[in-house]
Amino acid sequence: MPRVSQDHLDARRRQILDGARICFARHGYEGATVRRLEEATRLSRGAIFHHFRDKESLFLALAEDDAARMADVVAEQGLVQVMRDLLANGSEHPADWLGTRLEVSRRLRTDPEFRARWAERSEQLTTATRRRLRRQREAGNLRDDVDVHVLAAFLELVLEGLVSHLAMGLPADNLGPVLDLVEETVRRHRAREEITPA
């Protein structure tokens, strides 16, 4: 029997995650039946569950994948950029990502077992945000009168608010200036320090 290359396995896993993202976004966790997952991924249940133990593991892997992508953006450009990407028309699968994010939030609220499993995986976004903020503070770009943990919590709260706003279908056309304000709120303002009395 021929061996399957790691590249092939990785591509198949990506195909499953991409299809599952669409399926979970459209139907929610409960509505994403095995049959619907097969249709969305264009693969058999055997192929899907060769890579993932069960539907719960698939959903967790998908949510973790989204969180890792966000953490990568945060590390390079900050959490506000993640929010800007959500608003950008050209962002990859924004509605599907949003659906997954909302389903994670719902399950965190209603499913204690999921909450426990997710807690182990969800720290990466918070960690990436705090590291980015610390680097910005060391570079002199971040306000120093508020603790980094508080600033990270503020930014995460704004992200959750933006996700809710988009989920409700509210207009997002004019939110760029709002994100500018959020960004300015965490930056260090040197103008006051540089003004010398006459």
List PLM regions with ranges.
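Key DNA-contact positions within bacterial/archaeal DNA-binding proteins
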Residues: G46
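Alpha-helical DNA-contacting segments of helix-turn-helix folds
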Residues: F52, L60-D66
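Hydrophobic alpha-helical connector segments
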Residues: A61, A71-G99, V148-L155
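Amphipathic alpha-helical segments used for helix-helix packing
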Residues: E92-R117, S164
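Hydrophobic/aromatic-rich alpha-helical bundle segments in the mid-to-C-terminal region
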Residues: R115-A119, E123, R137-T185, H189-A198
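Basic, helix-initiating cap at the start of DNA-binding domains
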Residues: M1-H27, G31-L43, E56-S57
